[in-house]
Amino acid sequence: MFGRILSSLTILVFALVVGAELAIADDYRPAPGIPDRYGILYDTPIYDPVSKSYFALIWAHKTVYRGTDWQTANAEAMSREYKGIRGRLAVVDSLEIHEFLERTFHPNVDAWIGLRYWCQKRMLEWSNGRIAKRSFQAWDLNWQQDVYACKSGDKNTDFMPVAYTPTDKGFRWIGKGRHKEYFAYFVEFPTGHP
């Protein structure tokens, strides 16, 4: 009897804690089009005339303590639509796009982009399927920051996703393990026009 009561209380406390985390995460969720308390604009597509794409920094908090892994961010980006165009994790293949993202969104958290390193093949691939050229790169000096990157055990499907560091840490690319979670990601809508 006592064991059942204790078990029920444990479940109730767990549910309250998880519910509180979700409520707190939602309380801090900024409204689209309105900068948050740090001046960061989330969930609002902004047009870049150089690339002819819209970009948005997406709020990706699952709870206060949980973010979104790269694969989930990739799927969520592809499920988004703006002006009739499907989204994708952002392809940052030029200095102009890099500077646009930094200047426009200046994130204070790490944020996924549409780049991954295929470990077995030793190649970088963008979310649009193109192989990354060496023409533009924004790697941090300490770019591989995860001892678990490229060590999932499945050599054929193992990859290291790439994210931006916050602007106060240089706004540079870093590689992480597949299961790392971040609180934001960049989505791109390649409309070709405003």
What is the meaning of each model-derived region?
Residues 8-19:
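Bacterial N-terminal signal peptides
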Residues 7-8, 94:
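Polar helix-capping/helix-linker motif
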Residues 22-194:
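Extracellular, disulfide-bonded carbohydrate-recognition/adhesion ectodomains
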Residues 1-5:
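Positively charged n-region of N-terminal signal peptides that target proteins for export
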